[in-house]
């Protein structure tokens, strides 16, 4: 559980948005916090990738993943019928 002080204007804006979205203020603030933390984590991921890009071995795995299925099995969709 978190508890913090905020400017009256910010509280009024949060209340207005919560009413507009038909959700509770706590849900609005939880979602906003979760989104902000995800954005911060993404920024760290970008920085880590910039400082240490993927190796050739790691890129080879991505190429394998792009191969897809070896054969087209679409004609087997009705095989059990």
Swiss-Prot record:
Query: Keywords assigned by UniProt?
Result: Toxin-antitoxin system
Q: Which domain of life is it from?
A: Bacteria
Biological process terms from the Gene Ontology for this record are: regulation of DNA-templated transcription
Q: Does the keyword Nucleotide-binding apply?
A: no
* Pfam families (alphabetical): RHH_1
| Signal keyword on record | no
Read off the InterPro entries from this record: CopG
- What does this protein's UniProt record list under function? Antitoxin component of a type II toxin-antitoxin (TA) system.
**Quaternary state and partners of this protein?**
Forms a complex with cognate toxin MazF2.
Q: Please report the name of this protein according to its UniProt entry.
A: Probable antitoxin MazE2
Instruction: Identify the gene encoding this protein.
Output: mazE2
């Amino acid at each position: 559980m978190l508890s913090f002080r905020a400017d009256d204007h910010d509280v009024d804006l949060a209340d207005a948005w919560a009413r507009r979205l038909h959700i509770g203020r706590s849900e609005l603030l939880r979602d906003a916090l979760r989104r902000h933390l995800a954005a911060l984590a993404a920024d760290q991921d970008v920085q880590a990738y910039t400082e240490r890009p993927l190796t050739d071995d790691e890129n080879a795995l991505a190429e394998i993943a792009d191969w897809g299925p070896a054969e087209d099995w679409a004609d087997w969709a009705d095989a059990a019928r």
